[in-house]
A protein has these predicted regions:
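Conserved hydrophobic positions within beta-strands
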Residues: 45-47
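Bacterial N-terminal signal peptides
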Residues: 11-22
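Short boundary/loop segments of OB/S1/cold-shock single-stranded nucleic-acid-binding domains
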Residues: 26-41
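Short, structured beta-strand/loop micro-motifs enriched in basic residues and often containing a Trp
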Residues: 26, 77-86
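OB-fold/S1-family single-stranded nucleic acid-binding modules
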Residues: 107-132
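N-terminal secretory signal peptides that target proteins for export/translocation
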Residues: 1-9
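Short aromatic-glycine-enriched beta-strand elements
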Residues: 53-64
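Short nucleic-acid-contacting surface segments enriched for D/E, G, S/T with interspersed K/R
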Residues: 85-102
């Protein structure tokens, strides 16, 4: 036999548990929380590493700054590899050692050498990835 009082206690508890799980999930996907979308810049660097893994694609660049010093940058497209694959993008499209440019990049709020990018081209301007929706321009 069902206990109506027991069910009444379970409902608020289940609702609270659901909401507590949702808060970190929303924070994880808050681009404006991690990146300063009011600041836009471009980087030019040599690809040193590519992390083609969920939840988001990350790639690493050696970038020569204005003082001639090499800085290591880590950048993300904000997309997961499965979505990029469905859009026709392949890991092989960005070979290690390639000189690439990031387009419409936004820096990390913590002032680390981290950014999210809106597009990637090779140094000669050949587009690789455009937009943050997993679109390929090849």
């Amino acid at each position: 036999m069902l206990n109506p009082a027991g069910n009444m206690l379970k409902t608020p508890f289940m609702l609270a548990a659901f909401l507590l799980v949702q808060i970190p999930a929303q924070a994880h996907h808050s681009i404006t929380g991690e990146f300063d979308t009011a600041v836009t810049f471009e980087l030019r660097g040599t690809l040193t590493k590519l992390d083609w893994a969920n939840p988001h694609l990350w790639y690493y660049l050696d970038v020569v700054n204005d003082a001639g010093v090499v800085e290591q940058w880590q950048c993300t497209t904000g997309q997961n590899p499965n979505r990029l694959i469905r859009a026709g993008w392949k890991k092989e499209d960005l070979p290690i050692g390639s000189v690439i440019r990031t387009l419409r990049s936004n820096p990390a709020r913590d002032e680390s050498n981290t950014c999210i990018v809106g597009g990637i081209t090779f140094d000669d301007g050949t587009p690789v990835f455009s937009g943050n929706k997993g679109e390929t321009t090849q």
